Amino acid sequence: MRLPFQPPPTVQHRVTGLKFFYLTVTVYGLLLCIAVSGWLVFALHQPSIVSLALRYDFLSLYIGARAVATGHGSQLYDLNLQRVMMNAATAPYIRPLNFGYAYPAYAALVLVPLGLLPFAAAYVVWLGCNLLGVGWTLRHLIPSSAATKNERIALTVVAAGFVPLLLTLIQGQWGVVCLVGIMILVLARRRGAPYHAGIGLCLALVKPQLILFPLLGLALERNWRSLIAFALGAGVALGTSLLLLGNWPPVYFAALGQLREENNVVGLDYPSAMHNSRALVYALFHTETSGPALALQGVLLLASLAGLLALWLPSARRPALPWEVRFALTLLLGLLTTPHLYLHDVIVALPAGFLLWQASGRALDLVATARRWPLRLLRGVLALGPAVCFCAQLWNPPFIQLVPWYMILLLGIAFWKWSALALVAPGDTMIAPMVRV
């Protein structure tokens, strides 16, 4: 159970103005209504749940779960078998492109219960599980991020209309599992339970590219207990999958290559549809292999690594940031740098946004009035995040990929106001502590 959160008595919480409240609720409420109503109109015009769900990424997850559940785990990456299972699951409809299982084999073991269900029922159950995960996450993030009831309402509307979250729910993707894993790490870190933190982060192994920078941050922090717990959890997952499904890694990578060849640009590696530094470079140069493109990618990677080192290595020349702020910025650096990031994967930025919103609000109460405008700028840019993702989903301007440019701007402002964010006491930037039951 969770104890009610009481703001620290030494912190003067900033009251959100009514104008900002009404503007936020109106704008993001409208965007939420547009997104949800548009999907509902489309969904209601489908003759069945199967005809709706076969268009989404969940079909890939289901094929893997179905293969293991029906005793074909050793043939998990046999594309011919995957085609047969896909056609059987979506009958009487036929999907024109092969959309096979393209995730590590241990992830399919988690979904075996869904593989025992018909495709339509599995999609509905998975959607319900994801909604529960989102509700649990927001229940921990929103109350402690808001100073007033109005701010809680505004943050709820903003989070509910976050396009990566909506895409993850509709597509039936893995993002909520990764989100819950990251939240478990954050909560466990606050409780002083490093082993729980490492085990929680194992949930994000379904998309390991999303947690590379957080793992590097834990290593730079010398949080060996969390890393040991993570390594043990990862070892159990890998060992179990090898024991039950055979030596799958070589077959897995071969199947990925075959899927890319068969699906061409609609396949697994589509940089112009991504939202990371790689997509930023591709939008500018329309290639990833030219000299300027490679040079810019190298500069962005080195800058991200330099930022990571600055966050986690102590220095006498700069004050230390609270752990939660460092972790939030590490998450954003990781999303910017990862080579594979579609818009639905940006759902894991939710904790980062809330933690930075908290910290900047606390910092506003601790700096002189004349020095508050950069922090207000930071909060304004944070508030624009969901709108940027909404525009990125609907609009693809030439030479510009909105989300990575937005992340660079947000990170730049946060690093610029390092000294102000460092004023916040570590206990004042964190979500409500949990009690073991």
Residue ranges of predicted features:
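Short basic/hydrophobic patches in alpha-helices and adjacent helix-turn junctions
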Residues: 67, 283, 334-339, 353-362, ...
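Structural signature of hydrophobic alpha-helical transmembrane segments
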Residues: 173, 202-203
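Aromatic-enriched
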Residues: 357-437
